[in-house]
Design a protein with these regions (language model features):
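Extracytoplasmic/secreted proteins, especially bacterial periplasmic and envelope-associated proteins
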Residues: 45, 49, 72-75, 86, ...
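Short pre-active-site segment immediately N-terminal to redox-active cysteine/selenocysteine motifs
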Residues: 69-72, 76-80, 123
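Non-catalytic, surface beta->alpha helical segment in thiol-disulfide oxidoreductase systems
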Residues: 123, 128-159
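Thiol-based oxidoreductase modules, predominantly thioredoxin-like and allied folds used
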Residues: 76, 87-95, 99-114, 121
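Structural signal for short hydrophobic segments within the conserved structured cores
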Residues: 43, 103-105, 136-139
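C-type cytochrome heme c attachment motif
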Residues: 79-86, 126
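A short beta-strand-turn-helix
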Residues: 45-71
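N-terminal targeting signals for export/organelle localization
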Residues: 1-51, 159
């Protein structure tokens, strides 16, 4: 009788330990998936980040000089803007599709009005397609994903 009791207790403890290990592994995998998703998501920029990663518009207001190490797309948007909300999931998909090849930046014109004013942003969404050299190509309004892909391929990746 005692032998059966110890066997049942042992099995119960093994099941509990296995459950804890399985739950722990699931949490680690979920964290890894979240990290991967964040790694390839559009990057929201503040004024200081824009100046250090994209262009220092405070020091040089006449000439565009891109500071990044990869071409980029800059989305000037507002949280209340309908067309901007339509473009957002497209940019998330493109961030994953072109991960490692380009950056996709987002600038909230309400939170960062100085950046918007420096580049004359009056219509949103306004998108800058910034190659490594030369001036950015500018597009205003929402576009289908295929148009974004064409601009990225031709202007940024030059394929």
């Amino acid at each position: 009788m005692k032998k059966k009791f110890y066997i049942y207790v042992g099995l119960l403890l093994a099941i509990i330990a296995g459950s804890f290990l399985w739950i722990s592994r699931q949490k680690e995998e979920a964290k890894a998936r979240v990290y991967e998703a964040k790694k390839s998501a559009p990057i929201h920029l503040t004024k200081a980040e824009f100046i250090s990663k994209v262009a220092n518009f405070t020091a040089n207001q006449t000439d565009w000089k891109y500071l990044g190490d990869k071409p980029c797309v800059i989305d000037f948007y507002a949280t209340w803007c309908g067309p901007c909300k339509m473009v957002a999931p497209i940019l998330e998909d493109l961030a994953s599709q072109y991960d490692g090849q380009i950056y996709i930046y987002k600038v909230d014109v309400d939170a960062e009005p100085e950046i918007a004013a420096a580049y004359g942003i009056q219509s949103i969404p306004t998108l800058f397609f910034c190659p490594m050299n030369g001036t950015p190509q500018i597009s205003q309004g929402a576009m289908p994903k295929e148009s974004f892909q064409k601009m990225i391929t031709e202007v940024l990746l030059k394929k």
